[in-house]
Amino acid sequence: LPAGLSQWFPALEVLDVSGTGLTEMGMELLSLPCLHTLLAKNNRLGGPGSLPKGLEQAPLARSLRVLNLSGNRFSEVPPALLQLRGLRSLSLGGNRLHGIPPDIQELYSLEFLYLGGNFITAIPPELAKLPSLRYLVLCDNKIQSIPPQLAQLHSLRSLSLHNNLLTYLPREILNLVHLEELSLRGNPLVVRFVRDLTYNPPSLQELAGRTVKTRNVPYAPSDLPDSLVRYLSLASNCPNPKCGGVYFDSCVRQIKFVDFCGKYRLPLMHYLCSPECSSPFSSASQSSTSQSESDSEDEASVAAHRMQKVLLG
């Protein structure tokens, strides 16, 4: 930043230095106590010293509301940014991020978070601890699954997940009753997931545990070792209303399409106690087709009715 900026403009509120080739912001930034919007996208920030030391203690840490650092070279979210507690909008799209730090939860005033166009592979559950978040953009990454905790974002209005590696959504996402926009295009969704489903037969311990639970065999803690008592307490009920069985470690994963907001049919994950609890149309197609084959060949191995109502964006 130019020297003397804070002396010439002590009451500066908006600063746009986008596309100027900046490699570091400089100490001048710390002397702008009224700054609430900083736009520094499409630069070369991201190396050591890109952000001034002491940023989290500067008046800026309290005044800044909007920060856009998209189109730079950050490989991680700078820890100093996680101390800007007044931020309402943070954009770090088009960088080189490989993850989202759990401390993102410290930005509890955040309403808009843009992390699209990076190399993010996972979403930390802590992201769900942003009570004011309304717009979450995670498109064009390498995300394979959505943590069920994300359903705790009760203020969320827009969720962009297109062009990732998602094969299914947790059923908890149905709790996002205020969601108005959901983008999922460009994800594998159920195509390859259904093809690759496998079922591991239950162990003898699991078979015995299922018998005890389904037939209500009485037992007392003194009858069994503590480890088996704990094991029996971990039984999960099969969601098939015609079954009434339970499972422990061995289960069948099934995709079920569920109405969402009255507009879409989304593929959600269900866990069943055995393949017999799956409908004939929901059993996995055990294809040995390689990952390198085209999506059109993948789709041919999945019943058409499974794919025709998947939300694409």
Regions found by a protein language model. Name each.
Residues G46, S50-L60, L64, I123, ...:
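Leucine-rich repeat domain C-terminal region
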Residues P2, G26, P78, P101, ...:
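Zinc-coordinating Cys/His ligand positions in small cysteine/histidine-rich zinc-finger domains
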Residues L1-T23, M27-S31, T37-R44:
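WD40 beta-propeller repeat fold
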Residues F193-G313:
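Cullin-RING E3 adaptor/co-adaptor recruitment helices
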Residues E13-V17, L35-A40, L64-L69, L87-L92, ...:
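Conserved hydrophobic beta-strand positions in leucine-rich repeat
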